Amino acid sequence: MAKKVLVVDDEKLIVKGIRFSLEQDGMEVDCAYDGEEALKMATENHYDMILLDIMLPKMDGFEVCQHIREFSDMPIVMLTAKGDDMDKILGLEYGADDYITKPFNILEVKARIKAIMRRTAGSQPKKEDSKVIEAGDLRLDCESRRLFILNKEVNLTAKEFDLLELLVNNLNKVYSRENLLNLVWGYEYPGDVRTVDVHVRRLREKIEKNPSEPKYVHTKWGVGYYYYQN
């Protein structure tokens, strides 16, 4: 089955170029030119990837991303201006999985999309390999990709789940940010290690009673992160 991608940008020439290139690779591409249209399409369809510009009419990309995260963990890649680090951080804070800076090379876009799709597909366990992982108060159902804390479900994005699953599967093992970037985002992922910090912070906000004094995901200062259990 062809992968389905939603491309959102108010610059029609950019959308046209991305659409043509992705369709050449056998993907099915839908297009939206403003935030409200994008949110409507994301609500009514499932996409394997959403390419989402930040500067959009009617509703900006941050708000669109935030709304999508209320009901879906579809992978979202934000299109940001070159050198605008704040936009990159905000995009990740609002739930984006990755970002690509403009102007970009279409080959980079295609490579990034394929890398994330491979990672997302690889994180979906087969039924015969499904399992439930328990660590203290946490229970991860790896088949349905659902997290429960004290039997109460906590909604995670795809990357948040992948990150937590890796740490819980390796209790008390410290991973550097570079290792986590490689293992969770893929070895070909060319992103910034700050991506890891933002996802850890978001994860703590969801699973920790007091994120500033974490019970589960700990920091080994100067080294990296680990899931603590006695």
Language model features with spans:
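Short, Lys/Arg-enriched segments at the junction into DNA-binding effector domains
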Residues: 4, 115-174, 178
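Charged docking surfaces used in two-component/phosphorelay signaling
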Residues: 13-24
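Basic, amphipathic DNA-recognition helix from helix-turn-helix-like DNA-binding domains
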Residues: 58-60, 66, 70, 75-134
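Active-site residues of response regulator receiver
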Residues: 9, 53, 80
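Active-site beta3 strand of CheY-like receiver
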Residues: 46-51, 56
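Short hydrophobic/Thr-rich beta-strand motif most characteristic of the beta2 strand and flanking loop
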Residues: 26-33, 41
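DNA-binding patch around the recognition helix
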Residues: 130-132, 155, 200, 204-230
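Conserved Asp/Asn-Gly motif in the active-site loop of CheY-like receiver
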Residues: 32-36, 88
